[in-house]
């Protein structure tokens, strides 16, 4: 699925899950979102839940074709975003991981390595040039964990928002979007409402 001419959706749908984070009923499943930005350099945005490693890696390979990704941007360290960082780096050892300093510290605890020799640490205002696309990074602590960054693609005017603007439900199910987005907001990020409001009002 192409989001724009250069941005491809490579996430997966989970129809086996019944409780998200062990407490929120998700009768229509969940989607774990990941994207490929196809430019002079290829950036992969986030990974997916560990139960979908092979499907996701197949999606990455299909999106990249004969090429290999140059960057993996890890915006959030919750497992539904980061569980396949190690698997990705095993397949693409020449790729660089782009993430916040706090996220790399968490990787050492989660995975036993912080990928020091393949790490690009980014902070508020940093940019990554892919060619036509420039990614700008915005610090978004506590949306939903303290290490979170979100990423803005100025070429296509697309915000990759981590947990900030999510919803419950798999993407291959027809349902009322607003209802599940509202339920997700109040269940997952409502306690950080001020930070979400600040994030959405950024220029």
Identify the role of each PLM range.
Residues 87, 109-112, 170-174:
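Short acidic, glycine/serine/threonine-rich loops at helix termini
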Residues 40, 51-98:
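Active-site metal-binding motif and surrounding structural segment of the metallo-beta-lactamase
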Residues 40-41, 68-69, 93-94, 116-117, ...:
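Short coil/turn connectors at secondary-structure junctions
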Residues 2-64, 150-153, 157-161:
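Conserved beta-strand hairpin/beta-sheet module of binuclear metal-dependent hydrolase folds
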Residues 2-5, 99-203:
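Metallo-beta-lactamase
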Residues 77-82, 104-106, 144-145, 166-169:
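Active-site environment of divalent metal-dependent phosphoester hydrolases
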Residues 43-46, 70-74, 136-137:
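Short catalytic-loop micro-motif centered on adjacent basic/acidic residues
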């Amino acid at each position: 699925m192409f989001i724009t001419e250069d941005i491809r959706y490579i996430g997966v749908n989970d129809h086996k899950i019944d409780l998200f984070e062990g407490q929120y009923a998700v009768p229509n499943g969940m989607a774990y979102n990941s994207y490929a930005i196809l430019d002079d350099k290829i950036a992969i945005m986030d990974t997916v839940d560990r139960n979908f490693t092979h499907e996701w890696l197949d999606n990455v390979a299909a999106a990249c074709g004969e090429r290999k990704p140059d960057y993996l941007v890890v915006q959030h360290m919750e497992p539904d975003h980061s569980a396949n960082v190690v698997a990705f780096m095993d397949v693409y050892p020449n790729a660089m991981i782009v993430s916040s300093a706090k996220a790399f510290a968490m990787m050492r605890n989660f995975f036993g390595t912080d990928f020091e020799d393949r790490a690009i640490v980014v902070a508020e205002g940093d940019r990554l040039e892919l060619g036509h696309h420039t990614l700008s990074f915005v610090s978004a602590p506590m949306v939903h964990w303290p290490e979170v960054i979100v990423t803005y693609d100025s070429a296509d005017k697309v915000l990759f928002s981590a947990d900030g603007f999510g919803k419950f439900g798999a993407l291959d199910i027809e349902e009322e979007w607003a209802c599940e987005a509202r339920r997700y907001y109040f269940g997952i990020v409502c306690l950080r409402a001020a930070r979400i409001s600040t994030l959405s009002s950024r220029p």
